[in-house]
Design a protein with these regions (language model features):
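N-terminal secretory signal peptides that target proteins for export/translocation
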Residues: 1-8
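Bacterial N-terminal signal peptides
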Residues: 10-21
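Hydrophobic side chains within alpha-helical segments
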Residues: 14-16, 153-156
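Boundary at the C-terminal end of the N-terminal hydrophobic targeting segment
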Residues: 24-28
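Hydrophobic beta-strand segments of well-ordered beta-sheets in folded domains
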Residues: 29-36, 66, 89-92, 164
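Metalloprotease/metallohydrolase-associated module, dominated by Zn2+-dependent proteases
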Residues: 36-53, 113-137, 141-142, 158-218
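Metzincin-family zinc-dependent endopeptidase catalytic domain
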Residues: 45-154, 160
Length: 218
């Protein structure tokens, strides 16, 4: 899925367009995910770090920590730790320089399987940058909020939208103000669903380790 803004309306708003393809800074939270970041867009190191702080804030408020691994900056490989198939607690986020959808106002895309699960999402930086200029928000916070929304879809699936919060199908002026202030987040129900999923995955890992007598990947 991805965000898009309605060009013909006078209000400042962002809307969410479902584009799910059929085919999450470390904190003190007990539950944690790792997000492998491929920055293939002209996003500076400092702007990316601030965006990661914002996305981590959103997830931390839901009781989930994020460990970021910056795999690529432009054409330069930053970390070799990304050269593996993502485990169950790992997700891959690519910041692409330009959009890859036919609708040029879509801001990103989460790739979901038929069961609503996924590991990969893309953000389209040129469109986010354009929206930032039009809406006069903070580019790092907007980038981080869009990242949190797309990662949220990887947790919550195709039917993840809510009337309020970061997973709302439409971001109107109040939501944009919350983005600018760094207060937009998941609902309580969404937080519980995401934590329950991680707890199930952890339980599977512990069971696997006890049966096999070795750590293994999960």
């Amino acid at each position: 899925m991805g965000f898009h803004w309605k060009k013909m309306l006078p209000e400042l708003e962002l809307a969410v367009l479902l584009c799910g393809s059929i085919a999450a800074a470390a904190s003190g939270d007990n539950l944690q995910i790792t997000v492998l970041v491929y920055n293939n867009a002209p996003v500076s190191v400092s702007a990316l770090k601030q965006a990661e702080v914002e996305a981590a804030r959103v997830f931390s408020a839901a009781g989930i920590g994020i460990a970021w691994v910056n795999c690529m900056q432009g054409s330069r490989t930053v970390s070799e730790a990304c050269a593996h198939v993502p485990r169950s607690d790992e997700f891959v986020l690519q910041i692409a320089p330009t959009g890859k959808t036919s609708n040029d106002s879509v801001f990103g895309e989460a790739f979901l399987a038929e069961d609503g699960r996924g590991k990969y999402c893309d953000l389209f930086f040129d469109r986010i940058e354009d929206a930032n200029l039009r809406f006069r928000t903070n580019i790092s916070r907007l980038l981080g909020a869009v990242a949190a929304h797309e990662l949220g879809h990887l947790f919550l699936g195709l039917n993840a939208h809510s009337k309020v919060g970061i997973m709302a199908p439409v971001w109107e002026q109040q939501s944009l103000r919350e983005v600018a202030m760094g207060t937009l987040g998941f609902t309580g129900v969404q937080s519980k669903l995401m934590k329950a999923r991680l707890e199930r995955e952890q339980a599977k890992f512990i069971s696997f380790r006890s049966r096999n007598g070795r750590p293994g990947d999960y």
